[in-house]
């Protein structure tokens, strides 16, 4: 990918040069007749000495956070059997940069938010560090340091890293994301396309303060997260970086963007998303304490009702009024769903007071509760509505994950 990017940059340079030369040729042709007569009167062009105060709220905000935004470098084992095309289409997997025989697989961004003794803590996206064999963090001053993983949470796509604080100058501060306003300035700071563009800043506004965004994880499961929407330019490599307000406070951790419509027919601009700072602070505090996030689990494998064929749906004998829900594919022995009497073929339509039309709805409803809470689950069996009081005594770490269907 690095080679492809350089090629594009060079091509842009050539086109720009051609335009400049063309303009020069036109100017000369229109002034040629008087050139000889005016040579004695020509004067050289000079740079103006007038100074301009360029300090603004934006430049001040960027200055406050720039030293705390870093590049995160993910090294993985080199796959010698991979195609030569992987260097073009596989991110930085073809990079010559390596450490201890490992290959630089990808790069993202991160934010230093805390110093404690000889350590400093960095928050980034989980997908930035996924699959790593080794991690480096490139500081704003150019120093590259080793990083270790304190903890991560796939569901919220957040991770906490620990590095030496020796060269750390500043740490970022978090704003209260519950007080954000649509239309207020938003600035993204990170490393788009990798560390060669480290500490790139782009400016926009907050387009929305709360959006439900559906993410597809590497294992195929989908999750719903709450996100801030912005039109500040966010590109590959910005993941894990800072979205800041006009005071230089972090209001979100940049995470994703929409580039095309779902069917790929229309390109999209200005739809970037960040995890709100209040959610970030809640998760990183738990990751620092426990290294993981414990969430309640039902103990089922499931499939969305909408994904079943007409023939399969008819066998469930559902009333015509039931058009959405989650079909229990199997029940794991010893977990809450089994203890409450749920069986394969049941169709869950509600958890507590929250309607469930998909697996992401079920996850969102379930994860709003704590372990050992008791919730009422509404489901259909043989066409009849039933309820079960389910004690959420187990966590997601107790789940079997070998099935291709979603688990919870």
Curated annotation (Swiss-Prot):
<dbReference type="Pfam" id="PF13365">
    <property type="entry name" value="Trypsin_2"/>
</dbReference>
<dbReference type="GO" id="GO:0004252">
    <property type="term" value="F:serine-type endopeptidase activity"/>
</dbReference>
<feature type="binding site">
    <location>
        <begin position="298"/>
        <end position="302"/>
    </location>
    <ligand>
        <name>substrate</name>
    </ligand>
</feature>
<dbReference type="Pfam" id="PF13180">
    <property type="entry name" value="PDZ_2"/>
</dbReference>
<feature type="active site" description="Charge relay system">
    <location>
        <position position="239"/>
    </location>
</feature>
<keyword id="KW-1133">Transmembrane helix</keyword>
<keyword id="KW-0645">Protease</keyword>
<keyword id="KW-1003">Cell membrane</keyword>
<keyword id="KW-0378">Hydrolase</keyword>
<feature type="transmembrane region" description="Helical">
    <location>
        <begin position="6"/>
        <end position="26"/>
    </location>
</feature>
<feature type="active site" description="Charge relay system">
    <location>
        <position position="127"/>
    </location>
</feature>
<feature type="binding site">
    <location>
        <begin position="237"/>
        <end position="239"/>
    </location>
    <ligand>
        <name>substrate</name>
    </ligand>
</feature>
<dbReference type="GO" id="GO:0009266">
    <property type="term" value="P:response to temperature stimulus"/>
</dbReference>
<protein>
    <recommendedName>
        <fullName>Serine protease Do-like HtrA</fullName>
        <ecNumber>3.4.21.107</ecNumber>
    </recommendedName>
</protein>
<comment type="similarity">
    <text>Belongs to the peptidase S1C family.</text>
</comment>
<dbReference type="GO" id="GO:0006508">
    <property type="term" value="P:proteolysis"/>
</dbReference>
<keyword id="KW-0720">Serine protease</keyword>
<keyword id="KW-0812">Transmembrane</keyword>
<dbReference type="InterPro" id="IPR043504">
    <property type="entry name" value="Peptidase_S1_PA_chymotrypsin"/>
</dbReference>
<dbReference type="InterPro" id="IPR009003">
    <property type="entry name" value="Peptidase_S1_PA"/>
</dbReference>
<dbReference type="InterPro" id="IPR001478">
    <property type="entry name" value="PDZ"/>
</dbReference>
<feature type="domain" description="PDZ">
    <location>
        <begin position="302"/>
        <end position="383"/>
    </location>
</feature>
<keyword id="KW-0472">Membrane</keyword>
<feature type="active site" description="Charge relay system">
    <location>
        <position position="157"/>
    </location>
</feature>
<dbReference type="InterPro" id="IPR001940">
    <property type="entry name" value="Peptidase_S1C"/>
</dbReference>
<dbReference type="InterPro" id="IPR051201">
    <property type="entry name" value="Chloro_Bact_Ser_Proteases"/>
</dbReference>
<comment type="function">
    <text>Degrades abnormal exported proteins and responsible for the propeptide processing of a natural pro-protein and for the maturation of a native protein. It also plays a prominent role in stress (heat shock, ethanol, puromycin and NaCl) resistance during active exponential growth.</text>
</comment>
<dbReference type="InterPro" id="IPR036034">
    <property type="entry name" value="PDZ_sf"/>
</dbReference>
<keyword id="KW-0346">Stress response</keyword>
<dbReference type="GO" id="GO:0005886">
    <property type="term" value="C:plasma membrane"/>
</dbReference>
């Amino acid at each position: 990918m690095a080679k492809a990017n350089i090629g594009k940059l060079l091509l842009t340079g050539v086109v720009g040069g051609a335009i400049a030369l063309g303009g020069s040729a036109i100017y000369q042709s229109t002034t040629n007749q008087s050139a000889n007569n005016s040579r004695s009167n020509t004067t050289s062009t000079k740079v103006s000495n007038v100074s301009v105060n360029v300090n603004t709220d934006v430049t001040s905000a960027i200055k406050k956070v720039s030293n705390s935004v870093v590049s995160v470098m993910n090294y993985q084992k080199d796959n010698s059997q991979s195609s030569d095309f992987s260097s073009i289409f596989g991110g930085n997997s073809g990079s010559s940069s390596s450490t201890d025989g490992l290959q630089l697989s990808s790069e993202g961004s991160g934010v230093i938010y805390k110093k404690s003794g000889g350590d400093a803590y960095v928050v980034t996206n989980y997908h930035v560090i996924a699959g790593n064999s080794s991690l480096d963090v490139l500081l704003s001053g150019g120093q590259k340091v080793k990083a270790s993983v304190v903890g991560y949470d796939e569901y919220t796509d957040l991770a906490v890293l620990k590095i030496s604080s020796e060269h750390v100058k500043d740490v970022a501060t978090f704003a209260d994301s519950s007080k954000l306003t649509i239309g207020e300035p938003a600035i993204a700071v990170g490393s788009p396309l990798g560390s060669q563009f480290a500490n790139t800043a782009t400016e926009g506004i907050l387009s929305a303060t709360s959006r439900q965004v559906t993410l597809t994880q590497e294992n195929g499961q989908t999750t719903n997260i709450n996100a801030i929407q912005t039109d500040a330019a966010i590109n590959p490599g910005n993941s894990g970086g800072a979205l800041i307000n006009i005071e230089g406070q972090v209001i979100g951790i940049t995470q994703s963007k929409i580039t095309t419509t779902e069917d790929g027919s229309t390109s999209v601009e200005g739809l970037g998303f960040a995890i709100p700072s209040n959610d970030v602070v809640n998760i990183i505090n738990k990751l620092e304490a426990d290294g993981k996030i414990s969430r309640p689990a039902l103990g089922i494998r499931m499939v969305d009702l909408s994904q079943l064929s007409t023939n399969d749906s008819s066998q469930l004998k559902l009333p015509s009024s039931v058009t959405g829900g989650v079909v229990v594919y199997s029940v794991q022995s010893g977990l809450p769903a089994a203890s409450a009497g749920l069986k394969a073929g049941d169709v869950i339509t509600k958890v507590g007071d929250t309607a469930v039309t998909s697996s992401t709805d079920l996850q969102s409803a379930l994860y709003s509760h704590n372990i050992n809470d008791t919730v009422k689950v509404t489901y259909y069996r043989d066409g009849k509505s039933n309820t079960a009081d389910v004690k959420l005594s187990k966590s997601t770490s107790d789940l079997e994950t070998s099935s291709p269907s979603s688990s919870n």
